[in-house]
């Protein structure tokens, strides 16, 4: 028998191992019906009248088999691809056993092969049991010495289960993420936890998967509900409505062909001939390969016919084999049947395996081969023996082919479009892509051969040149010029990275960009902007999780996987038994993966810095040090009236970082050489988001749990070196973290100190409020993270058995365990806001002459405040605000503002005191606000101690009514600690939290832009968009295409509504304003 070019003819003569060619089998398993309906070359020959194998073409009234159309695969049927063609057989009689197997297979696909649990309950992707190891898993296992390349090898070593012989009808094809985790933790050799692997058995009538047992179930009182995992039959299509009458008549006819049940619990079954027709359609697929018994020229007895026909397909026997129960089958049909439905005889259901099949007696074979068949060709009508029937039909086919060639040479019809009738021939451009490929198949082959021979295989250039010549010949010169420009690399379209930069910097959501892309393409006729899928491809290289890297030594308690994107903020938190689930929604990047992406974003700047310093590129592969500024701040309530999700408080907390500098310790140099320094350390463009969480910053327990994994990753990175490819060479980096971008409230939260109203006023020294008011300038920085930890242990254990007040005085205000190390410094932005708040209150008191009055009433204070607001609005154009913000503070702390206030102060002496106080403050302010005070304001730095001493004298004398025994937190830090911090760190302003506060404003805008119903997806969108917004790579494209961005913003309304004043101003909460 010749080999037929069709996927279903690949079944071997004997039953082979079920997974001998797993990839080929899997391809056949997931065939789409449109693929199966496609006319293959072998089938096209059959349509023209030729037989491949032992099949001959039939006249109009006859068919060679029960050919109704190309049927589907039985495995497709079992895997849920059910349709009217493959569920219902001839006469639409349903094969109940195949439906039952379909349900059973659906249950198996929902379970884990190794633990038996439901796949939907295990968070994470599912993995193929017979698949190959992915790159991440293989690299992780290679590091621990496992050289396995496929999952069956790993499963055999870890779970002691051989899955190489699994069958699709018995074993689940997937295993869950939990079992994957166990395999990875065991290094591919062993399992550290006991996993009971269930023993999978074939499907039976009383299968526990299809009909699970329930001990509380009473069958006689309540009807059992269908199982949850079972799939329902497909809905009836509109084609089924035409045969309603036939279906009703068929149901009535079934009663005549079904044998009555033999017992009270037995179900009736369909007649054997109908069952065989269904097997042909769904299992054997031999309609065009085996001969029908209707080709017999004589009217033979029924018993004789049953002896020469196959008990599976009802066709004449082809390569007959005999079972132990003396039933006869075609060799290929019984092999497919046993593989699909199990090793038993189709006729009597007795056990029958592939090894039990034998060849029938020679006498029977002689009778079978001598059967007379009638040739189905109309012009022939001869009676041909069965053994010579194939040669006879092949001769007819060769004659027809020769005749076609002669007629084609003698006529001009060969040059006309081929149309065999039916629908009129459509134009090439109106066809589907698949039909276009089919029509141009020969031309494509010729062009490919020419390109390989003449142009080195560049088929694209050949096709574009042909198109260009066709346009020139048709005088389409404008379109030809555009095509030629595109071929030369100077096309009209923008680069995908440019389009991504425009989308991010103009705050366009994906849907808004897609509408703009379609509008521009439709109106201009050119594809200036790139489609969304190209932008998503460009995004992948810029987001964390794209670049490979390595830590030496490996980070403790951190996964070695490099390709990790946005994860749950609580992942990595080791929960104890007593912990309750966190009432929060949080999303973050893994800290080390985010740092790698940020460094790759600075790759060009780092290489340029090496060249500017005259350092040899290949020699600088180690000794890199990276300084990181960390910032964290709560944003207050940003809740809206719409949106779904868990009822968590909508008080976001943002944790971000900024790469401040990159330096290298070159060989032979005493000091490190700085090759990159962030030019705008307080810009929102350089402050990269790491974590977003909906949590109240006052909730110490939840905040500790959310930031705990970040702290663990941060501490692990301090003791390891990062190996990363920069500039084509692997280089090692060490990271130094400085937590400086925190306000007073957040510092006290992280360091375990009492709240801002505590007696212990300062987070830098141990002074009380009374001590700080008596001695305003002579203090030094004494607190540290390690000291706070030691004091917490004293507070927790009380080793000296002291009273509460004595113990509190000993630990200096430490009341909780510090969980994140912060740098003992002063935040410049919040210092400005806190001092401006204090000056605002001084102005009120001076207007009301509080130095004369003991206890003014609340109404009097309100009137003074109203007068001050009115004067500032009139003279300074300053609108009153509910809470002090950065913009208001900058305008209030000026000489113009104090002059406006002096107009409301009656005493000349008090006016001069106010002017002197503001003048001293204006001279002191640049020292803590400038990025590098030694270079930018050296004179103010030298006079700072004198000015602060004079400032303190004014407060303790002229304004003694307000500062007698008390002083604010930020005024104390301003007067006492600024010179020491500047001498130690070189700057205060560069390490401020202003970039993170500006990012809070961006958060509100991104949230409006990406308003999805789920808070989880909303945080992911905001985090991803904000990261892209801070990309140096995209900022360079934005600088080069400013005009494109301005034109886009002028033509498209990106937000749809004006920004509120709350978003326009940087709103920062300060208590008691």
Curated annotation (Swiss-Prot):
GO molecular function, one term: double-stranded DNA endonuclease activity
UniProt free text on domains: The RING-type zinc finger mediates the E3 ubiquitin-protein ligase activity. The NBD (nonamer binding) DNA-binding domain mediates the specific binding to the nonamer RSS motif by forming a tightly interwoven homodimer that binds and synapses 2 nonamer elements, with each NBD making contact with both DNA molecules. Each RSS is composed of well-conserved heptamer (consensus 5'-CACAGTG-3') and nonamer (consensus 5'-ACAAAAACC-3') sequences separated by a spacer of either 12 bp or 23 bp.
Chain positions of all zinc fingers (RING-type): 310-349
UniProt remark on cofactor binding: Binds 1 divalent metal cation per subunit. Mg(2+) or Mn(2+).
Protein name, per record: V(D)J recombination-activating protein 1
Positions annotated to bind Zn(2+) 3: 325, 327, 345, 348
InterPro entries, alphabetized: RAG1, RAG1_imp-bd, RAG1_Znf, RAG_nonamer-bd_dom, Znf_C3HC4_RING-type, Znf_RING, Znf_RING/FYVE/PHD, Znf_RING_CS
Gene Ontology biological process terms in this record: adaptive immune response; B cell differentiation; chromatin organization; T cell differentiation in thymus; V(D)J recombination
Residues given in the record as Zn(2+) 2 binding sites: 310, 313, 330, 333
Annotated residues for binding of Zn(2+) 4: 375, 380, 392, 396
Keywords: Chromatin regulator, DNA recombination, DNA-binding, Endonuclease, Hydrolase, Metal-binding, Multifunctional enzyme, Nuclease, Nucleus, Transferase, Ubl conjugation pathway, Zinc, Zinc-finger
Enzyme nomenclature, EC number: 3.1.-.-, 2.3.2.27
Subcellular location: Nucleus
Residue spans, zinc finger RAG1-type: 371-400
Species of origin: Oncorhynchus mykiss (Rainbow trout)
Annotated catalysed reactions: S-ubiquitinyl-[E2 ubiquitin-conjugating enzyme]-L-cysteine + [acceptor protein]-L-lysine = [E2 ubiquitin-conjugating enzyme]-L-cysteine + N(6)-ubiquitinyl-[acceptor protein]-L-lysine
CDD domains assigned to the protein according to its UniProt record, in alphabetical order: RING-HC_RAG1
Complex formation: Homodimer. Component of the RAG complex composed of core components rag1 and rag2.
Family: Belongs to the RAG1 family.
Annotated Zn(2+) 1 binding sites: 286, 290, 313, 315
Gene that this sequence comes from: rag1
Start-end of DNA-binding region: 421-488
GO cellular component, one term: DNA recombinase complex
């Amino acid at each position: 028998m010749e080999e037929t070019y069709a996927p279903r003819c690949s079944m071997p003569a004997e039953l082979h191992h079920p997974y001998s060619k797993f990839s080929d089998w899997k391809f056949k398993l997931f065939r789409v019906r449109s693929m199966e309906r496609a006319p293959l070359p072998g089938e096209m020959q059959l349509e023209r009248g030729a037989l491949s194998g032992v099949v001959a073409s039939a006249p109009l009234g006859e068919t060679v088999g029960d050919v109704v159309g190309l049927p589907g695969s039985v495995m497709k049927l079992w895997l849920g691809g059910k349709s009217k063609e493959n569920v219902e057989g001839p006469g639409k009689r349903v094969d109940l056993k195949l439906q039952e197997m379909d349900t059973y297979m659906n249950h198996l696909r929902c379970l884990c092969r190794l633990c038996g649990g439901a796949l939907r309950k295990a968070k994470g992707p599912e993995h193929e049991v017979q698949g190959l190891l992915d790159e991440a898993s293989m690299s992780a296992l290679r590091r621990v010495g496992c050289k396995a390349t496929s999952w069956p090898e790993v499963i055999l070593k870890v779970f002691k289960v051989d899955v190489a012989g699994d069958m699709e009808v018995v074993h689940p094809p997937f295993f869950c993420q939990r079992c994957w985790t166990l395999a990875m933790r065991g290094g591919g050799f062993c399992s550290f936890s006991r996993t009971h692997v269930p023993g999978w058995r074939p499907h039976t009538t009383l299968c526990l998967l299809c009909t699970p047992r329930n001990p509380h179930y009473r069958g006689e009182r309540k009807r059992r509900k269908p199982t949850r995992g079972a799939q329902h039959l497909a809905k009836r299509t509109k084609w089924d409505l035409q045969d309603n009458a036939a279906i009703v008549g068929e149901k009535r006819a079934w009663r005549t062909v079904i044998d009555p049940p033999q017992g009270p619990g037995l179900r009736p079954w369909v007649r054997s001939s109908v069952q065989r027709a269904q097997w042909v359609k769904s299992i054997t697929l031999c309609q065009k390969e085996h001969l029908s018994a209707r080709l017999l020229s004589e009217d033979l007895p029924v018993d004789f016919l049953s002896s020469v026909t196959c008990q599976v397909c009802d066709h004449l026997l082809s390569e007959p084999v005999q079972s132990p129960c003396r039933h006869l089958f075609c060799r290929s049909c019984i092999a497919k049947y046993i593989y699909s439905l199990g090793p038993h005889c189709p006729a009597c259901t007795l056990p029958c395996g592939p090894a039990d099949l034998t060849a029938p007696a020679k006498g029977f074979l002689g009778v079978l081969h001598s059967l007379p068949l009638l040739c189905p060709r109309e012009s022939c009508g001869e009676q041909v023996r069965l053994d010579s029937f194939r040669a006879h039909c092949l001769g007819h086919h060769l004659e027809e082919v020769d005749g076609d060639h002669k007629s084609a040479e003698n006529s001009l019809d060969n040059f006309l479009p081929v149309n065999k009738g039916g629908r009129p021939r459509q134009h090439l451009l109106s066809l589907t892509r698949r039909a276009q490929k089919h029509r141009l198949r020969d031309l494509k082959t010729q062009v490919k051969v020419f390109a390989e021979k003449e142009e080195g295989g560049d088929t694209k250039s050949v096709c574009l040149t042909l198109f260009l010549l066709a346009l020139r010949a048709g005088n389409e010169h404008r379109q030809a010029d555009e095509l030629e420009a595109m071929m030369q690399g100077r096309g009209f379209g923008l680069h995908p990275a440019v389009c991504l930069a425009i989308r991010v910097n103009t705050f366009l959501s994906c849907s808004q960009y897609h509408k703009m892309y379609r509008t521009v393409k439709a109106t201009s006729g050119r594809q200036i902007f790139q489609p969304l899928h190209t932008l998503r491809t460009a995004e992948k290289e810029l987001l964390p999780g794209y670049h490979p890297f390595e830590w030496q030594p490996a980070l403790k308690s951190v996964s070695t996987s490099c390709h990790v994107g946005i994860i749950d903020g609580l992942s990595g938190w080791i929960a104890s038994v007593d912990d309750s689930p966190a009432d929060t929604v949080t999303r973050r990047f893994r800290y080390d993966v985010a740092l790698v992406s940020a460094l790759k974003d600075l790759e060009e700047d780092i290489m340029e810095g090496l060249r500017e310093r005259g350092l040899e590129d290949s020699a600088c592969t180690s000794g890199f040090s990276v300084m990181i500024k960390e910032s964290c701040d709560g944003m207050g309530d940003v809740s809206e009236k719409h949106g779904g999700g868990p009822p968590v408080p909508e008080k976001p907390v943002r944790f971000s970082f900024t790469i401040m500098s990159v330096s290298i310790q070159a060989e032979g140099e005493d000091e490190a050489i700085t090759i990159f320094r962030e030019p705008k350390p307080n810009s929102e463009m350089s402050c990269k988001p790491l974590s977003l969480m909906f949590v109240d910053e006052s909730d110490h327990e939840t905040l500790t749990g959310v930031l705990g994994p970040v702290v663990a990753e941060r501490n692990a990175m301090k003791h390891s070196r990062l190996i990363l490819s920069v500039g084509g060479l692997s280089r090692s980096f060490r990271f130094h973290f400085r937590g400086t971008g925190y306000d007073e409230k957040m510092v006290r939260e992280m360091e375990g100190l009492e709240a801002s109203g505590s007696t212990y006023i300062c987070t830098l020294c141990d002074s009380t409020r009374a001590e700080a008011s008596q001695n305003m300038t002579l203090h030094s920085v004494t607190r540290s993270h390690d000291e706070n930890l030691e004091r917490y242990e004293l507070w927790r254990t009380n080793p000296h058995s002291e009273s509460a007040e004595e113990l509190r005085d000993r630990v200096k205000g430490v009341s909780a365990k510090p969980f994140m190390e912060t740098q003992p410094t002063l935040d410049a932005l919040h210092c400005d806001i806190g001092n401006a708040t204090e000056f605002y209150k001084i102005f009120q008191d001076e207007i009301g002459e509080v130095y004369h009055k003991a206890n003014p009433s609340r109404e009097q204070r309100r009137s003074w405040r109203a007068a001050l607001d009115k004067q500032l609005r009139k003279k300074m154009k300053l609108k009153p605000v509910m809470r002090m913000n950065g913009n208001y503070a900058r305008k209030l702390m000026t000489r113009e503002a104090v002059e406006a206030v002096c107009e409301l102060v009656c005493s000349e002496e008090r006016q001069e005191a106010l002017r002197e106080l503001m003048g001293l403050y204006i001279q002191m302010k640049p020292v803590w606000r400038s990025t590098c005070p030694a270079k930018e304001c050296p004179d103010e730095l030298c006079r700072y101690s004198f000015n602060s001493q004079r400032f303190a004298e004014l407060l303790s004398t002229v304004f003694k009514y307000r500062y007698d025994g008390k002083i604010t937190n930020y005024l104390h830090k301003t007067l006492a600690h600024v010179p020491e911090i500047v001498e130690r760190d070189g700057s205060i302003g560069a390490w401020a939290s202003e970039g993170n506060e500006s990012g809070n404003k961006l958060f509100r805008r991104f949230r409006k832009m990406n308003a999805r119903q789920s808070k989880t997806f909303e945080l992911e969108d905001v985090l991803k968009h904000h990261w892209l917004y801070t990309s140096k790579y995209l900022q360079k494209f934005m600088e080069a295409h400013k005009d494109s961005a301005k034109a886009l913003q002028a033509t498209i309304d990106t937000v749809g509504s004006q920004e509120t004043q709350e978003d326009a101003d940087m709103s920062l909460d300060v208590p008691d304003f």
